Every structure is written in structure tokens, then in C-alpha cells.
Amino acid sequence: MSDQPLTSVLEFTFRAATPDDASFIARYVLAAFHIIELDKPFSEEQQQSITALEPVVQQEGVLYSYRHAEIVEIKREPVAMLLSYKGENFREFRARTFQQLPFFTEEELASMDDETQAGELYIDSLAVHPQHRGCGIAQCLLERAVHRAKSLDIAATLLVDPENPKARALYERCGFTAEGRVNAFGVNFHRLVHR
């Protein structure tokens, strides 16, 4: 992995998200959580989840804010997204986020471990449209996030589902190593760190 992030590889480019990307970000966050599949029609319940998340994405001071997202485009069409943020405001942002979403009760949230903490750049969500997987987009997004963390002099962290060995292999190829477990959203995730 190089010290400098790639700004354009082959035919894909990177850009910061805007509030106008709310629908795209909502879909890709939900895809990262395996709630929807990007190449399949959405059920009514899945569409309701997207619709509920969109206004949250348009805000600042929440976990899934457009301000935390970087989008990859191919021929001006968005095809991938990585959402990351510094960990110091995690609890405040989580509370503000889930007060607006019908996904979890306060008791469920209180029983979850913190996904991140101060001194970290937490990679919350990463999703690539299935048509564009396997061509290096996810790796480039991860490299850019690691570069950002290094520029801030903090570690990059993420969680991976133990039932997703392909994702874990990608993260390990990018230099992430396992450091414990985190219980969140009903899953005992592996916590991976890049220092």
C-alpha cells in the first residue's frame, strides 16, 4: 500500500458527498449492514428504511451524515461509498442518530458496546455496487481512509462480521489487524485496527 491515496484509478473518481446524495448514502449504508441488496428490488420494508434514513443523512452531528461520506463515481454515476468519522463524539452522534430512526430501542442501544472512541477514525460503512466489485474500488477507499487517519495522527478502525470472511480478508490485505471484539446490533463483531 502506498503512502499517498489514489485520486483516480482507471475510470473511477472520488468526491465528497453532498446533501443531495442522501438517497444514495442511505441505500449504501443499509447495503453495508446487509439490510438491502443493491442489485435487487427493495421490499416495502426496505424502502421504508431508506426513506427513514435519508433525512438523517442530510444532517450534521449524526453518524450517517453526508459530511462523513466519500463517494466513488464511474462516468459520473455513483457506485460506491465509504463513511467514516472521528470517534470522540460517537455516543452523542449515536444517540442523536437513533432518536430519529425506528431501528433500535434505547435499551438495545444502551446494551451495545461503543464501536469507536476518541483517537480513532472509525470506518462505519463501506459498500460497492455488485457490478463494480473486484476492481479495487473498496481497497482504494480503505487506503484513502487510512491515509486520512495517518494525517490526523490517529488509528483507523472498523468492525467486521465474523460471518464475512471475504471482507475480513480485504481489510487484512489493507493492513488492518484484529484487536478484540465489539458487540453491536446483535452481532459479536471482530474489531480491526490500522495503526
Task: Go through the PLM ranges and name each one.
Residues 1-20, 40, 195:
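Conserved N-terminal entry element of GNAT/NAT acetyltransferase domains
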Residues 34-57, 67-68, 102-104:
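Conserved GNAT-fold acetyl-CoA-binding loop/helix
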Residues 57-71, 88-92, 122:
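A short helix-loop-beta-strand connector motif used in the catalytic cores of GNAT acetyltransferases and
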Residues 71, 77-86, 122, 127:
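Conserved beta-strand in the GNAT
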Residues 86-125:
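Conserved acyl-donor/pantetheine-binding loop and adjacent beta-alpha core of acyl/acetyltransferases
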Residues 119-121, 133, 149-161:
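Conserved GNAT acetyl-CoA-binding A-motif
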Residues 134-147, 169-173:
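Conserved acetyl-CoA-binding loop-helix of GNAT-fold acetyltransferases
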